[in-house]
Amino acid sequence: MANPRFLVIKIEKYLSMYPVVILTGVRQTGKSTLLENSFAKNWKYYNLDERALVSMIQSDPDQFIASQKSNFILDEAHKAPEIFHSIKYAVDSGFKYKIILSGSANFLLLKGVTESLAGRAGVLELY
């Protein structure tokens, strides 16, 4: 992983430009660790390795987004692809919080990610 402080500065720059930042890269590049160590203190952090959380999001992604009261992170976001259209709708409707999505490199190939978030998300890739 590149210098963590440099990456945090880059993520913060993207957050000033976009409502959503996508952090992607191959497995074991430090995406989750970077987000937990640098953002989880002041952001709501959701890890979608938790099956119950994925089920809740899948059952009503719009309600999940509407229930957010602060900036939030969806780590392993590719595990609940239903959320992408809901994020698009929320952003287009003036959602006032920032969102960081993380996932593996093939995350951007998922149907709905690029079409739903085009122009709404800045993409950073770790390698």
Where on the chain are the PLM-derived regions?
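Phosphate-binding site recognition
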Residues: 1-127
